[in-house]
Amino acid sequence: MGDTTKDDGSSQSKAVRGEKRAFFFRKWTRIDIARASAVGAVHLLCLLAPFNYKWEALRFGVILAIVTSLSITFSYHRNLTHKSFKLPKWLEYPFAYSALFALQGHPIDWVSTHRFHHQFTDSDRDPHSPIEGFWFSHVFWIFDTSYIREKCGGRDNVMDLKQQWFYRFLRNTIGLHILTFWTLVYLWGGLPYLTCGVGVGGTIGYNGTWLINSACHIWGSRAWNTKDTSRNIWWLGPFTMGESWHNNHHAFEASARHGLEWYQVDLTWYLICFFQALGLATDVKLPTDAQKRKLAFAR
C-alpha cells in the first residue's frame, strides 16, 4: 500500500507541543557527562575534518558509517530488538559486535531502550518521546539517564540478551573495544582518520539514527492508521538504511521489511534478503494482508 495520507508532510505533529524537560539546569550523573563528552567529541572532530583530512580517510569514514549503520539496523534493531528474523550465532554475534563501533552503546542497553519506545510510544514513559520536544527526542534524552530510569524502570525487558554470555561480555567491555579500535585506526592513518572516521563517520551514523526518533515522529506522511505520531520520510530512506519508513515500522513492528513498497528504498531489507537467499536468515517475518487491511486508512 502506498502513502495514502492526509498529511502532506509540511505540517508539524502535535507531539512537539508539550512540556519540555529541563536539560542544562538539573543534576548530571557521571554517565550523562561521559555520554555528552563522547557525542561532543565526535561532532568536534567532524568540524575539524575540513582542516585535517585525506580523501582516502574521508572514504574510510563514509564506508565506516555505512557498515556500522547497517549493523545497527540489521542487528540491534530488526534482529535483536524485534526478532524479525533469525541468524546462526556465528553470524549474529559478528554483526552485533560491529554495531559497537557506531558508538550507540552495547546491545543490551540499545535493545532495551527501543523495546521501551515501542511499549510506551509517544507517552510520558517513552524514553525519547517527541512530546517533550524535538531536541529531547533527537539527542538530549541520551544524556538524562536518571530521567529515563524513572520513566522506564530497569532493564528487565532484555532477559533474552542478558542470558547470553556474549552480550554480557560486550556490556562489560564496550569501552575497551572502542578504544582499541580507534587506537589502531590512529596508528594506521594518523589524525585524518580520526577526524574523518570518528568525526564524519560518527556524525553521519549518529544523526541518521536520531532523525528516526525525532523527525520521523514529527514530519512526513502516514501510510497506516497507527495510534502514534510515526511518519514516513521518503528522502531519508537511503541514508537511514530504510529506517525512515517509520510509520510502516510502527504499524508492523515485527516486520523485517520497513520499505513495504517496491519503490521504498530499504537497504537493510536487501541485506536480509541476501542472507535469506543463502539460507542463513530464517523465520523472516512480514505483515499479512489481514494485518494491512486492519491498519489501512479508509478510502
Swiss-Prot record:
Biological processes per GO annotation = unsaturated fatty acid biosynthetic process
Q: Which domain of life is it from?
A: Eukaryota
**Compartments it resides in:** Endoplasmic reticulum membrane
The UniProt comment on domains reads: The histidine box domains may contain the active site and/or be involved in metal ion binding.
Family the entry assigns: Belongs to the fatty acid desaturase type 1 family.
Instruction: Spell out the protein name for this chain.
Output: Delta-9 desaturase-like 1 protein
User: InterPro entries annotated for this entry?
Assistant: Acyl-CoA_DS (IPR015876), FA_desaturase_dom (IPR005804)
Which residue numbers does the motif Histidine box-1 cover? 77-82
Membrane topology designation:
Multi-pass membrane protein
Q: What is the lineage of its organism?
A: Eukaryota, Viridiplantae, Streptophyta, Embryophyta, Tracheophyta
Chain ranges for the short sequence motif Histidine box-2 as given in the UniProt record = 114-118
Phosphoprotein listed as a keyword: no
Q: Which UniProt keywords apply?
A: Endoplasmic reticulum, Fatty acid biosynthesis, Fatty acid metabolism, Iron, Lipid biosynthesis, Lipid metabolism, Membrane, Oxidoreductase, Transmembrane, Transmembrane helix
Q: Pfam families of this UniProt entry?
A: FA_desaturase (PF00487)
Q: Which GO terms describe its cellular component?
A: endoplasmic reticulum membrane
GO terms of molecular function: oxidoreductase activity, acting on paired donors, with oxidation of a pair of donors resulting in the reduction of molecular oxygen to two molecules of water
- What's the EC number here? 1.14.19.-
Q: In which pathway does it act?
A: Lipid metabolism; polyunsaturated fatty acid biosynthesis
| Span of the annotated motif Histidine box-3 | 246-250
Q: Which prosthetic group or cofactor does it need?
A: Fe cation
Transmembrane stretches in the record are: 31-51, 55-75, 174-194, 198-218, 262-282
